[in-house]
Amino acid sequence: MGTKLGVPNLWEILNKKKIKATFFFTVGPDNMGRHFWRLIKPKFLFKMFRINPFKIYGLNILRSGFIGKGKNIGKICKNEIKSASKDHEIGLHAWDHFSWQTWINMFSKKKIIKHINLGKNALQHIIKYPVTCFASPGWRTNEYVLRTLKNNFNFSYNSDCRGSNLFFPYLGDGKIGSLQIPVTLPTFDEVINIKTTIKKYNSFIIKLIKTQLNFSVYTIHAEIEGMKYKKEFEEFLNIAINEGINFCRLKDLIPKEIENIPIYKINHKTIPGRDGWIAYQQKIIK
């Protein structure tokens, strides 16, 4: 399990480099094994051949929740989550990651609220302080979800989509949603053996960071960079630090004055290397 095994490794690496980061945790059932049913989709099947999931994740992670209900991540990984919370910003990723990523477009308002409440309450019970940020599983959200989150939860920001800069999402009725801090860089599994190789991956990401003017938001996964490729991740940090790249928590990107942060739409699109759609930042609303 990524949280159980990968988070302590990431925590150790980041602390050794004196880097503060933001961790988003899934704290409900581990149903990753249910993604096996997506093998009937050609794009997902190709991705599995491309990244070799058995080598990266291991059989125990891949079979979690394949049949029956997966183990409760928050309960069996509470010590790992609590340790990370002592030095880093903690946010909610999901109660049930698989369910949200697969069916969020069919979720009712009641179900959205239930998922967030279950996750938020479980995470707060572990870390013993309020959860103030949220990141949608698989970068999947929509206007209905954003409105529900804005009206029912007091998150200081969300990180629900891909994009280039801080913005407020337009909700279509003259209102805006909670502040968004979008992810600006691709993930390991999206580009390996498509745009780069494992040996060249760190250089590939560093070059992208240098082309992004304001800031870069880089997503890593405990089950990848915290396990199989933890050595490569530490090498990435060494290169970045030597290149003068600074790291911070996501909340540190929020300016004191937020009145001039622009308003954008959130739309859906597909991207190379990822099965299905993601939410992304689209054209400014005047």
UniProtKB/Swiss-Prot annotation:
Biochemical pathway: Glycolipid biosynthesis; 4-amino-4-deoxy-alpha-L-arabinose undecaprenyl phosphate biosynthesis; 4-amino-4-deoxy-alpha-L-arabinose undecaprenyl phosphate from UDP-4-deoxy-4-formamido-beta-L-arabinose and undecaprenyl phosphate: step 2/2; Bacterial outer membrane biogenesis; lipopolysaccharide biosynthesis
Pfam families for this protein: Polysacc_deac_1
Family of the protein in this entry: Belongs to the polysaccharide deacetylase family. ArnD deformylase subfamily.
GO molecular function terms listed in the Swiss-Prot or TrEMBL record: hydrolase activity, acting on carbon-nitrogen (but not peptide) bonds, in linear amides
Segments passing through the bilayer: none
Any one GO cellular component localisation term in the record: membrane
Identification of the protein by name: Probable 4-deoxy-4-formamido-L-arabinose-phosphoundecaprenol deformylase ArnD
Domain NodB homology span(s) in chain numbering: 1-248
InterPro entries found in the cross-reference section: ArnD, Glyco_hydro/deAcase_b/a-brl, NODB_dom
Catalysis: reaction(s): 4-deoxy-4-formamido-alpha-L-arabinopyranosyl di-trans,octa-cis-undecaprenyl phosphate + H2O = 4-amino-4-deoxy-alpha-L-arabinopyranosyl di-trans,octa-cis-undecaprenyl phosphate + formate
Keywords recorded for this protein, A-Z: Antibiotic resistance, Hydrolase, Lipid A biosynthesis, Lipid biosynthesis, Lipid metabolism, Lipopolysaccharide biosynthesis
GO biological process annotation, one example: lipopolysaccharide biosynthetic process
Organism for this UniProt entry: Wigglesworthia glossinidia brevipalpis
The encoding gene: arnD
Function (record text): Catalyzes the deformylation of 4-deoxy-4-formamido-L-arabinose-phosphoundecaprenol to 4-amino-4-deoxy-L-arabinose-phosphoundecaprenol. The modified arabinose is attached to lipid A and is required for resistance to polymyxin and cationic antimicrobial peptides.
HAMAP family, per database record: ArnD
PROSITE patterns: NODB (PS51677)
Annotated EC: 3.5.1.n3
